[in-house]
């Protein structure tokens, strides 16, 4: 490793170390007492969460010291690499993002929390491009399509008969075939300390101990949490110089969640109920941005057919870190927002004949705006291509053909097609 590479590696390692104590989801989640109190009141009273509630649960790190360290790293990146160095620009942005994340966590229970969340993850009112529909529009459009599917009544959900233990065993077996059984690369285990049905770490997937699953759920988790989230983390950990690619600031969350949803679709692992879950989150965030409170969002989920406990869980995702009458935590916009952005990126890469760019989405916790730079860094030997790639991205033939058709279909008018097909459909 030459001096230039060593400089990048040392600065990169400092970013990885500095972000270690930051645990966003742990810092914003509501504890079991809040859930029990709300359900005991039959969902009629606001959860007892305010600024004082978060003050009673202080951050597990010295926020001032962490912000200062990122400030120092950002200054040292400029001092040692200059203002326009491509790797330096990525690392400086990461430092700024992490400082903003810490400020958001310091603002738990205040109006600033929701405002900073919008800066980091976006808002439901954001348009994809000038003149295009917003995320909120996308949520409503998808809901309409899903309602048409639901109205048929013949696409039934499989009953959830698999326990967490059975889901763990199935996932472990499948992922061992992908990542290597002998190496024990990925561990899958039960956990009672998570809000979602599953969550991925660096080399593990946690399954909520009291959750029930069906075979479709397990397949989606295999693709979403395993092939994408754990896969990109392992590829990031495999980077010899740009070690920062093993960690994901908010800008990479949008790209990574979008990539995971896209993988579900092209692996035929998604299904209407799964998509409904994502659209409901987007619609709920839009409701809160329009002024809805916790009880109104809770009722929205009840109207969607969820039981009281699940409706509480869904609503609390939207308000975690905030208060029951405050602005939402907008991280859950990442799924649909990221899907559209990543899909468009791959479409354009195929149109322009730049297929070599696409697999680099998996070389770590990548961010779309960095993709051209990452291609350059691979050519310079500063970034290594991904070791673990889903088969759909190892062989780009099928995906390329799909995107060629997709590029053409974008030019057709669905309204015109609907009118012309009215006599045959």
PLM-predicted stretches and their roles:
Residues 1-134, 403, 408-425:
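N-terminal low-structure segments adjacent to metalloprotease catalytic domains
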Residues 52, 56, 61, 216, ...:
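Post-HEXXH active-site segment of zinc metalloproteases
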Residues 81-213:
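Contiguous, non-catalytic segments that form substrate-binding/exosite surfaces or channel walls
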Residues 173-184, 230-238, 263-273, 348-351:
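Secondary-structure boundary elements
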Residues 198-204, 231-237, 309-315:
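Active-site-adjacent bridging/hinge elements
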Residues 218-231:
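Short alpha-helix carrying the canonical HExxH Zn2+-binding catalytic motif
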Residues 246-286, 338:
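Post-HExxH zinc-binding segment in Zn-dependent metallohydrolases
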Residues 274-425:
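Conserved alpha-helical "signature site"
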